[in-house]
């Protein structure tokens, strides 16, 4: 695998750290007036999802992580695994709860997801940026109730709970940003 010098470190670069793939989220290159230059890096381990900071000397290097991001279609959940299919090869992959994590609440049938593979096994699943889900439970909105500028909690068809405006009712389909978990709009 490729080896990266500290000068090559950029946000989004995937490297091996302690035998586990990690992605660089922030990188700051520091050249002090006296002494050797170094890179202060913030990383997120892809398997354990831990955030950590590490300092690399300018002479250090890191091995590139052999991970692949591929687009797969979400099929179904059998209770233990979430199943995805490659639309080109029709090959199916099963991701466990550790790989899916909190994103399980945004997975809907036939959604295009980005799945990160390491050693041909899924280690991370990223749902589409926006999903359209039906509201299955929320408090009824009262006409003229504009005293609070906030919203009300609504339970969606996948079990996720988001804050929605007061005018949104049960049975309506809304668009949700999966990155922040916030209401975006009603779907016409």
Swiss-Prot record:
Report one GO cellular component.
cytoplasm
Top-rank taxon: Bacteria
**What NCBIfam families does the record tag this protein with?**
efp, PRK00529.1
Q: How is it modified after translation?
A: May be beta-lysylated on the epsilon-amino group of Lys-34 by the combined action of EpmA and EpmB, and then hydroxylated on the C5 position of the same residue by EpmC (if this protein is present). Lysylation is critical for the stimulatory effect of EF-P on peptide-bond formation. The lysylation moiety may extend toward the peptidyltransferase center and stabilize the terminal 3-CCA end of the tRNA. Hydroxylation of the C5 position on Lys-34 may allow additional potential stabilizing hydrogen-bond interactions with the P-tRNA.
Plastid found in the keyword field? no
Q: State the pathway, as annotated in the record.
A: Protein biosynthesis; polypeptide chain elongation
Q: What is this protein called?
A: Elongation factor P
